[in-house]
Amino acid sequence: MSARLAPPPPLRAVRMYLHAQHQPVALMRTDCHVCRSEGLAPRSQVLIVAGEREVQALLYQIDSDLLATGQVALSEAAWTALDIGDGDSVVVRHPPVLESLAGIRRRVHGQRLSAGELAAIVRDVVQGRYTDVHLSAFLTATAALPLDLQETE
């Protein structure tokens, strides 16, 4: 029998009108019950879900009454990706583990990528799951030992 954790309670979305060069950003209070129960810290990656839509965002936290309890403010990139209205309910939680990072770690240690590993990396990049650090690791891994013909077929 596998135990399923209950999803975190929903928060009300507030449009922040923050333009962050296409970077999805979420702003939450440091005393937010979701931050505490989920163990979310500043500069964490979070997954924001609104119905069938989701976006991975960078979390910043504030010690201010700028946001009410139970609210999360979103940048324009996050707002557009979710296609929501002011006050709509969203769920904020940890993003899923990136299995494709195992391929990058193997590549850093001199092993070649399989077609499946490269496809998983590309899929995660296209879906916006890679942070700048993840992208830098991929570029470093492929620059130190360039991709060979078999890896790019």
Predicted regions and their residues:
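Acidic, glycine/proline-rich low-complexity segments that act as flexible tails and inter-domain linkers
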Residues: 96-153
